[in-house]
C-alpha cells in the first residue's frame, strides 16, 4: 500500500485565468483542428468533440445531426452489421468521416466489427471501449485490432494514468480515451472506490500521449460548456460528451410519461438498465456500476451543440486563443472554492 500526497483536481476545482487578447469577436476563433494519426497515418479535420458511445447518445440520428457541426459521434456497439450497412448507404461522405465504430473485446465483437468494416470501408475510426483499460487482455486486443485493421484510426480506453496511456499507444492505439468514473450516470467510484479526478487525469495522460505522438480523449466529467473548455485547456485533443447530449430528439432513449410530462431515460452502459437490455440482466458475479435517470425532453441537439461551441469560442477569446489548438498553450488554471453565484439556482 502507498499514498500519493499530490492533490488531484477535477473540473469543479479550477477556473481558467483570463489573459490579454487581441481578438475582436468570438467569430474570429477557429474551432476546427487537423490531426494526422500515429499508426493509421490518416488525416482528419473537424471540431474535436465526440458524442459518447452510449446507446442513449451515440445513435445514427445523432451522427447525422452533429456532422453538420463537424462534430464526431462514436456510434454505440449494439447496432447490427445490417443496420450499419443501411445507415452508410443512406449517409453522405461528410457524415461518415465523423463516425466511429464502437466495439468491445470479445471474439463476437471482433467478428462483427470485422464485418462492419469490410462492408463499409469508408469508415475510418474504431473505438475499442471497455470500462477498465488496465487488463492484459485489453492490451492484447488493441494489438490484434491494429494488426487486423492497419489503416484504421484506433481509439482505446478507458485509462487515467500516463504509463497505461503509453502502453496502449505502443500497442497500436492512435488515440487513448481517458476517464474512470467521472460520467454523469457512472457509479464506478462509489461502487469500487476506484477513480481519478478528471482534469488531473487529462493533464497526466496528455503529457504521456503527446510524447509518443498519440492523442487523448477526455471522456466524462463535463456538465457545462466551461468544463469542455477546461478539458481542452488541460491538454485533451478531443472531448467526449454523454450527459450533455442526452435527452434530445436524436438520443434514442425510451420516452416515459409522469404526471402528464414526458421524460427520456438515460443510463450508464454498466447500469442494470443497460445490462438488462443487452445481455439479459446483471451477472451474479458483478455489480451494476451505473444509474438510470429521467431527463426532461430537450428538443433537437443542434441547439445544445451551438451552446457548447459558443461557450468554447468565448473561452478562447478570454485567453487570446485564435484557434482551439492554442487554448492549452494559453491556459493557466487557478484553484478555486467556488464556480458560480448560485443564489437563483433553485428557481
Curated annotation (Swiss-Prot):
Cellular component GO terms held in the UniProt record: cytosol; GMP reductase complex
InterPro entries per record: Aldolase_TIM (IPR013785), GMP_reductase (IPR050139), GMPR (IPR005993), IMP_DH/GMP_Rdtase_CS (IPR015875), IMP_DH_GMPRt (IPR001093)
GO biological process, one term: purine nucleotide metabolic process
Active-site annotation: 186 (thioimidate intermediate)
Residues where NADP(+) binds: 108-131, 216-239
Signal peptide (UniProt feature, chain positions): none
UniProt entry tagged with the keyword Nucleotide-binding: no
Keyword Transmembrane: no
Record key words, sorted: Metal-binding, NADP, Oxidoreductase, Potassium
Enzyme class, spelled out: oxidoreductase
GO molecular function, one term: GMP reductase activity
Reactions mediated catalytically: IMP + NH4(+) + NADP(+) = GMP + NADPH + 2 H(+)
Family: Belongs to the IMPDH/GMPR family. GuaC type 1 subfamily.
Classification via NCBIfam families: GMP_reduct_1 (TIGR01305), PRK05096.1 (NF003470)
The protein's role, per its UniProt record: Catalyzes the irreversible NADPH-dependent deamination of GMP to IMP. It functions in the conversion of nucleobase, nucleoside and nucleotide derivatives of G to A nucleotides, and in maintaining the intracellular balance of A and G nucleotides.
Official protein name in the record: GMP reductase
Lineage of the organism: Bacteria, Pseudomonadati, Pseudomonadota, Gammaproteobacteria, Enterobacterales
Amino acid at each position: 500500500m502507498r499514498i500519493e500526497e499530490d492533490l488531484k483536481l477535477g473540473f469543479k476545482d479550477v477556473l481558467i485565468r483570463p489573459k490579454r487578447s487581441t481578438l475582436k469577436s468570438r467569430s474570429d476563433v477557429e474551432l476546427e483542428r487537423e490531426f494526422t494519426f500515429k499508426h493509421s497515418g490518416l488525416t482528419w479535420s473537424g471540431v474535436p468533440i465526440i458524442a459518447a458511445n452510449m446507446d442513449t447518445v451515440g445513435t445514427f440520428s445523432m451522427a447525422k445531426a452533429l456532422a453538420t457541426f463537424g462534430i464526431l459521434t462514436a456510434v454505440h456497439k449494439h447496432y447490427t452489421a445490417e443496420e450499419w450497412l443501411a445507415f452508410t448507404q443512406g449517409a453522405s461522405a461528410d457524415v461518415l468521416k465523423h463516425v466511429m465504430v464502437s466495439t468491445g473485446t470479445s471474439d463476437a465483437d471482433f467478428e462483427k466489427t470485422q464485418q462492419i468494416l469490410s462492408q463499409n470501408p469508408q469508415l475510418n475510426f474504431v473505438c475499442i471501449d471497455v470500462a477498465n483499460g488496465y487488463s492484459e487482455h485489453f492490451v492484447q486486443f488493441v494489438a490484434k485490432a491494429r494488426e487486423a485493421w492497419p489503416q484504421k484510426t484506433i481509439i482505446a480506453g478507458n485509462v487515467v494514468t500516463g504509463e497505461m496511456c503509453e502502453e496502449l499507444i505502443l500497442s497500436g492505439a492512435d488515440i487513448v480515451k481517458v476517464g474512470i468514473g467521472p460520467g454523469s450516470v457512472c457509479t464506478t467510484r462509489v461502487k469500487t472506490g476506484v477513480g481519478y479526478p478528471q482534469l488531473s487525469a487529462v493533464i497526466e495522460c496528455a503529457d504521456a500521449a503527446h510524447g509518443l505522438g498519440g492523442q487523448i480523449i477526455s471522456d466524462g466529467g463535463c456538465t457545462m460548456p466551461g468544463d469542455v473548455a477546461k478539458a481542452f485547456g488541460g491538454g485533451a485533443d478531443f472531448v467526449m460528451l454523454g450527459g450533455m447530449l442526452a435527452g434530445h430528439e436524436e438520443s434514442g432513449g425510451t420516452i416515459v410519461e409522469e404526471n402528464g410530462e414526458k421524460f427520456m431515460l438515460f443510463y450508464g452502459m454498466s447500469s442494470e438498465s443497460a445490462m438488462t437490455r443487452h445481455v439479459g440482466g446483471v451477472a451474479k458475479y458483478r455489480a451494476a456500476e451505473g444509474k438510470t435517470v429521467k431527463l426532461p425532453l430537450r428538443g433537437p441537439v443542434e441547439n445544445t451543440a451551438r451552446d457548447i461551441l459558443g461557450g468554447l469560442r468565448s473561452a478562447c477569446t478570454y485567453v487570446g486563443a485564435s484557434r482551439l489548438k492554442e487554448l492549452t498553450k494559453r491556459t493557466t488554471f487557478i484553484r478555486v472554492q467556488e464556480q458560480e453565484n448560485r443564489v437563483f439556482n433553485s428557481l
